[in-house]
Amino acid sequence: MSIIFFIILFPLIGFLFLSTIQDFIFKRYTLNIGIFSIFISFFITCFYGVSILKNNNQVFTQILWKWLSINEFKIDFGFFLDGLSLSMLFVITGVGLLIHIFSSWYMRYKEGQSRFFAYTNLFIASMSVLVLADNFLFMYLGWEGVSVCSYLLIGFYYTELKNNLCAFKAFILTRVSDVFLMIGMFLIYREFNSFNFQEIKFLSSFLNVENFYYLDYITLFLLLGVIGKSAQLPLQTWLSDAMVGPTPVSALIHAATMVTAGVYLIARTHFLFLLTPGILYLVGLIGTLTILVSSISALVQKDIKRILAYSTMSQIGYMFLALGVKAWSAAITHLIMHAIFKALLFLSAGSLIKSCKNEKNIFKMGGLRKQLPFLYISFIVGGASLVSFPLITAGFYSKGNILFSVLKSGCIDFFIIGLFCSFLTAIYTFRMIFVIFHGKNIHTADSSTNLQHNIPLFVLLLLSTVFGSYISPPLSDVFPLSYTPIDHKFAFEIICSILSLSGIYLSYYIWIKNLYVLDKIFQFKFMRYLYYFFLKGWGFNWFYKISFVYFYLYISKRLSADPLNKIINYFLKVTQIFNFYLLKTSNGYVRWYVASMILGINFIFLLMLFFYFN
């Protein structure tokens, strides 16, 4: 008996339970319900993980029921569990479980605790649907479900107008992208007469690419459909503003899981992208440009969560870069590693913000390493993995594999930018760490924690080290076999290590040893303008505001007068006037009615005579 649907069922039950009876149970029970439902999903995922590994990457399927059946058009509610789905599920349920445990500490005395766990349970259920669905339409149900959850959790503190506006912005920008995804799905059905992933994969192997020009449009629309969700250029602006929600939300949705949905979808449909090398190159180009823009933007941010948000865009950019050079397994491996060390950094940031009485400006902290030693270690390990610190971190191996694959693919321009941005990553990451934990002690921190706080951080910390590099997703039967020559890899690793260490040292030199260097740099007016330009995200928000928002407001203002309605109202007034005088004829006098009838008959006779003689 297949029990795949239990992975979705228990978080869904948790959501319904917490949404309906939250006023009738103690708050501590809501924590337990929210965590237990995710634990069951994680346990079932582990069960299937063992089964897949024991049975040579066996694939599991389950059809729940027929969704639609109209002539030959048939859509099932079906699940497909292979190595790729399993890898994503371990991130969703495993990292999700640790974040839920941490959230039981973070949200303990905060308002809306039950609502928070209800939303996060619904998110886990929706994300599980997204990665388990065996067809595009069922997948799209989960795709939109995670968008709704993201909107609800970004605007979780809905009493503040800014939070609501940020939630609207995220929702609208991702909807723009989703329109293209829908078009891509409809084109797929038009050409393949199916939404099922495996059927499309089978049919695509028989295509004559030269005569199938629609394939470029299909993959282009799929790409445009995923860049919004994964915060890639040019629809990346929502992610930095999404940090207004609770910090565990940023760890769960906007770092570890939802923003990687685009990477998953391209990987799932890799057989289509392989047939369109031009679009595949565009995937790598978008990833590379996003890496560059987000890395430079992170260098100038002061808000700790915005720094981590830009680093998330950058790391997802590396995944897109890997997909663009057909390094499928490297992209998914880095996705897993990134989910681990970025969850560690976000949860540590949440604990730090709470300890510093909701302060997020890193320059208003300082010298906290003695007050918060465990958080200091967590930031060091998570940051080291983010910057690919050599040999002892998981990020060194996962990101190193991506850059090496790019080098061997011959995309030297992509490789140089990726390598340069790896250097920038080391600078802005340890800038954040040095400013917060070194220097003068500016802020007094509250260091009260418990096991719900410490255990998730410790597990994530351990997996962010070299131990995490032993995680090997079972993808050999998912993607086509590829061979990357390993000659000169040692020299490549030496160069990457030198760049990472140089970035760390430069960060230490500027922000700890010689702060006056920055003052000298900002004496130049051009540098101050450049700093402001990067701080505002390269002007993307300004461009969208000028091009779309103001234009929409202008059209709305013009239409508020409603010219069409004025025309309709004109005819209405004419009818009302005619009706008013017509009613005057109904005065109750018989002589008036007889005279009117005679006059009418004479008028009709005159018309008849006129038309007869003409």
UniProtKB/Swiss-Prot annotation:
Q: Which key words tag this protein in UniProt?
A: Cell membrane, Membrane, NAD, Quinone, Translocase, Transmembrane, Transmembrane helix
The answer to whether UniProt assigns keyword Nucleotide-binding to this entry is no
Q: Where are the transmembrane segments?
A: 1-21, 33-53, 79-99, 136-156, 168-188, 207-227, 247-267, 271-291, 327-347, 372-392, 410-430, 455-475, 492-512, 533-553, 593-613
Reactions it catalyzes: a quinone + NADH + 5 H(+)(in) = a quinol + NAD(+) + 4 H(+)(out)
Q: What is its main location?
A: membrane
A Gene Ontology molecular function term of the record: NADH dehydrogenase (ubiquinone) activity
| GO annotations of cellular component type | plasma membrane
Q: Name one Pfam family in it.
A: Proton_antipo_M
Q: What is this protein called?
A: NADH-quinone oxidoreductase subunit L
- Gene name, please? nuoL
